[in-house]
């Protein structure tokens, strides 16, 4: 009768149907009411994985009635039976038969869209009857194709405004003088080039309508050969002559200038000898320079060293570069509107304060090319400023450039926002425990963006757990 394969004959529960690495793990429990299988009948149960495009039958279960089992055993003994692959062949018990169907098969890509069904077949008295198909599982649990990608939220800091924007242009002029003289001869040797350097610097500042000149600081140095006293007088007179030259050329007031006499430049000599491996008897030369002798005694000892070879070398190769004037043109820059700042940043970024740059950045869309560029310029101009470094780190994090972010964060200080950015760095880098600690710390310190990143952290942890469960 047709009720033999009704669902109360066979009940199924699927515990697991899941991809693990390259395998498919199957774990189902099939329960059969044995009282419904007559002595001369048998019930075959075939598990099948089926997708729209493909199906694969798995080894089946055969439950025999009492006489059917004897027939089966005899056929096997006589080697007459070419049976299909069986998971289990057993004589059906009179009551409930519980079969734990556990197996592992190679996982194939088509299986990720498959369902798992059981097809019952009742056989006996020369007729066969297929029962209603039973669905054991709607789908195979498979590893997702894509990992969860963290979408960070970043916390930028607006910098403190500068009250006065002090800036300076600095340089060094190597002027040639006639021996023992201090008059400036513009056409003498290379002086035309050296004076042009100073003139250009001063003119650039004077002609810029955004700038107020604050002062010019000049410091003159002499090389150490000869008497310290006369060299000091000479260095002083030469720097005065340079100040007078600039003053006349640009029609400045004398009080604009601050003059400093560096006298004999032993510090400069030491640095240059340390940097030049070709100096004869270099260690001995350095020992004299570093000694506590009076300058004139050092000079005499250098001249006498090793028959004068080291002295001749430094006179020719090092001393000319010690005779110089360092100059610093100090000025003050006015404040700019955002519109002006957008233009100035392209040509003279050093005239903008950090807070002006921040205002310029925020006039663009967050994350736009222009927005990012401003923060990158800011950190170039203010390379040691913690705020500039923090904001540049955020830009790097938004582009997933973790190495750059790490470099900037090393100089970003320990503000709550910097701690927050380090949390985001660890989150993007997969160090979730460390990220959690830092983000919680930032949240406690009042960084409101931390909450969104802690949500991302939880999503990433869940994704990791899910992925690991398929390994």
Give the label of every model feature segment.
Residues 1-471:
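N-terminal targeting segments with Sec-dependent signals, encompassing both cleavable signal peptides
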């Amino acid at each position: 009768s047709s009720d033999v394969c009704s669902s109360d004959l066979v009940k199924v529960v699927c515990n697991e149907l899941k991809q693990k690495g390259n395998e498919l793990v199957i774990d189902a429990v099939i329960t059969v009411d044995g009282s419904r299988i007559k002595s001369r009948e048998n019930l075959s149960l075939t598990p099948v994985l089926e997708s729209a495009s493909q199906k694969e039958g798995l080894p089946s279960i055969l439950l025999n009635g009492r006489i059917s089992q004897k027939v089966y055993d005899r056929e096997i003994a006589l080697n007459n039976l070419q049976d299909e692959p069986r998971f289990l062949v057993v004589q059906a018990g009179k009551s409930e038969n519980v079969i734990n169907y556990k197996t592992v098969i190679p996982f194939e890509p088509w299986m990720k869209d498959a369902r798992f069904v059981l097809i019952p077949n009742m056989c006996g008295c020369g007729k066969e009857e297929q029962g209603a198909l039973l669905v054991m599982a709607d789908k195979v649990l498979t590893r997702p194709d894509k990992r969860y990608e963290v979408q960070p939220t970043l916390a930028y800091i607006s910098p403190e405004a500068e009250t006065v924007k002090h800036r300076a242009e600095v340089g060094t002029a190597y002027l040639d003088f006639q021996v023992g003289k201090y008059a400036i001869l513009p056409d003498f040797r290379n002086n035309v080039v050296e004076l042009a350097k100073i003139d250009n610097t001063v003119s650039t500042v004077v002609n810029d309508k955004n700038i107020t000149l604050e002062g010019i600081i000049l410091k003159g140095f002499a090389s150490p050969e000869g008497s310290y006293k006369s060299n000091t007088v000479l260095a002083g007179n030469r720097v005065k002559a340079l100040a007078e030259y600039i003053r006349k050329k640009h029609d400045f007031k004398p009080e604009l200038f601050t003059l400093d006499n560096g006298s004999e430049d032993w510090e400069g000599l030491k640095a240059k000898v340390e940097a030049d491996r070709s100096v004869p008897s270099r260690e001995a030369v350095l020992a004299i320079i570093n000694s506590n002798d009076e300058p004139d005694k050092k000079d005499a000892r250098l001249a006498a060293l090793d028959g004068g070879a080291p002295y001749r070398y430094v006179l020719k190769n090092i001393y000319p570069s010690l005779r110089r004037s360092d100059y610093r043109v100090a000025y003050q820059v006015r404040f700019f509107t955002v519109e002006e700042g957008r233009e100035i940043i392209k040509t003279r970024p050093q005239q903008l304060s950090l807070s002006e740059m921040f205002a310029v950045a925020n006039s663009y869309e967050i994350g736009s090319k222009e927005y990012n560029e401003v923060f990158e310029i800011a950190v170039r101009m203010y390379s040691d400023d913690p705020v500039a470094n923090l904001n540049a780190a955020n830009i790097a994090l938004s582009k997933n450039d973790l190495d750059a972010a790490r470099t900037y964060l090393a100089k970003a200080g320990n503000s709550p926002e910097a701690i927050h950015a380090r949390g985001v760095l660890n989150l993007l880098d997969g160090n979730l425990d460390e990220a959690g600690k830092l983000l919680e710390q930032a949240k406690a310190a009042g960084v409101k963006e931390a909450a969104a990143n802690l949500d991302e952290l939880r999503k990433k942890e869940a994704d990791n757990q899910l992925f690991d469960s398929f390994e």
